[in-house]
Amino acid sequence: MAASTASHRPIKGILKNKTSSTSSRVASAEQPRGSVDEELSKKSQKWDEMNILATYHPADKDYGLMKIDEPSTPYHSMIGDDDDAYSDTETTEAMTPDTLAKKLAAAEGSEPKYRIREQESSGEEDSDLSPEEREKKRQFEMKRKLHYNEGLNIKLARQLISKDLHDDEEDEEMSETADGESMNTEESNQGSTPSDQRQNKSQSS
């Protein structure tokens, strides 16, 4: 019986029928205006915005942000308000390779200023030390310079390596010439008679 009632019902589609939508419009037009306002008031929600502001955005809430109470860094303008003091690059002309090479050549023999200051300050410190401590300090500084002077160490290592290679080449040449001479003597010994070999042995001993 359930199968027979299901077959008598019309199948409803997914799309709305034009007749059903027009009938609902007609019905809504026939209703008085007051009932429409009641329906809208039932469907809509009213928000208490002041309550929301008080709940979600209270005045004392910090939202996890840090408050920095320290004063901002003061700005100090340059000492000397001369226009020339602002930039040296504006007044200087472009550096040419020739002038740069001359300056480098002139500065090559001189030590940097910071090293001169270090030597002056170390001289003042040395006056407080005993002669033994001065000698110990001098030896330490010399060893430190030797240890950290990598350029000199690399040059020395290259010289030693080239010297070793040159010595090895000479040894190989000498061994090759010695091998060649021994082979020549062996060949000559093989070509001679046993009596000649005995004479050669007696002469060599």
From Swiss-Prot:
GO biological process: glycogen metabolic process; regulation of signal transduction
Region (Required for binding PPP1CC): 12-17, 43-55
Superkingdom to which the source organism belongs: Eukaryota
Basic and acidic residues bias spans: 35-46, 110-120, 131-143
PTM summary: Phosphorylation on Ser-44 by ATM activates PP1 by dissociating the PP1-PPP1R2 complex. Phosphorylation on Thr-73 by GSK3 activates PP1 by dissociating the PP1-PPP1R2 complex.
Stretches with biased composition (Polar residues): 17-26, 182-205
Example of a GO cellular component annotation carried by this entry: protein phosphatase type 1 complex
N-acetylalanine: residues bearing it: A2
Annotated positions of the Phosphothreonine modification: T73, T89, T92, T96
Family: Belongs to the protein phosphatase inhibitor 2 family.
Protein name: Protein phosphatase inhibitor 2
Lineage, highest ranks first: Eukaryota, Metazoa, Chordata, Craniata, Vertebrata
